[in-house]
């Protein structure tokens, strides 16, 4: 007969049928431990993957945030100075505030599985950088 400590639940292969039958309390305890172990494994894996994803994508996210900040800041300055005479500029400034929200910038569809940008450029950010450049040239504003 096998040592009962080989399997804390007493369910080793060498045990006879009468020993394998566990009390309802022991079955419930076994089920609870199994579920807890499963959940702990899932949580641990998620935490590890979340940290890895954060570590890999933080530099790119920070760069995109800086670029978005420059776009909004420049458009805000231009709109403040020239917006009363330029309806298109006012409209573009309001559109930029909507399109450049974080939910539109850090969307899954724009990134590869390796947390890189598709085609090495962000379509929304690049679009607005071009628009800002157009306005800066129009009003002869130096940005660098």
From Swiss-Prot:
It comes from Candida glabrata (strain ATCC 2001 / BCRC 20586 / JCM 3761 / NBRC 0622 / NRRL Y-65 / CBS 138). This is Protein YAE1. It is found in: Cytoplasm; Nucleus. GO terms for molecular function: protein-macromolecule adaptor activity. Belongs to the YAE1 family. The complex LTO1:YAE1 may function as a target specific adapter that probably recruits apo-RPLI1 to the cytosolic iron-sulfur protein assembly (CIA) complex machinery. May be required for biogenesis of the large ribosomal subunit and initiation of translation. GO terms for biological process: protein maturation. May form a complex with LTO1. GO terms for cellular component: cytosolic [4Fe-4S] assembly targeting complex; nucleus; Yae1-Lto1 complex.
